[in-house]
Amino acid sequence: MKIQQIRNATIRIECAGKHFLIDPWFQKKGTGMSAPSPDPEKAKTPSPTTELPFPVEQIMEGIDAMIVTHIHPDHFDPETAAMLDKSIPVFAVNEETKSQIEGFGYTSVMVLKDEGTDFDGVVLIRTEAMHGESPDQAAGPVCGIILQAAEEPVLYVAGDTVYYKGVERALEQYRPDVVVLNARGAELMGLGRLIMGAEDVLNVCEAAPNATIIASHMDAVNHATVTRAELRDFLRKHGKDGHVLIPEDGECLEFSGM
């Protein structure tokens, strides 16, 4: 299995010979949204705050399917949707998102299922996620995903979520070998924290002591509250720096089969 950090929450996954792209967001630096951060200076800064590490054509080379955990401007936006081959299979969190993606012109859109979908030997399982600190404040429908395949590590991509009972259930049920966390700790005016921050990552370390944890969704949007450097420092102080990998954009990690 290979996991390549592209930018933000966009990652490439190679599993059992299949190549998946999660949450493609290909806008150029400074041409997207300026999210309403509580920090007035950050609120003025347009996202993305970094460029892609590679050309879009290189990122998309060999991709067999895309997975969209939710429709937000920093996960799958209309500009990115217009760039890509509309015949590529796409897995969506729910029927509403499926319809939105079909509205972009995509012709092979499927809904992820809690019971799993077999995609050429790789089973994709939808998991719970909560995109905010409470159900009332959650920023729309979102999911995580489990990838399972013969002789491969079990991978859990938690998606845009805080640490809560739903994440605990996924960790307990699937016992993943590798866990990808969106860990920038973003905040929006009036909504509070949207995804995991440093303390949440520490909670996952304690809940999944035998898993390799990867921190993604870092250093690319204006409303982030945790940087890679800050997360590394926090984990070092808590003795967990050897438990969590924090890849730079473009970096590829490889894991042996189980």
Per-range role (PLM):
Residues 27-29, 72-76, 98-100, 115-118, ...:
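Active-site environment of divalent metal-dependent phosphoester hydrolases
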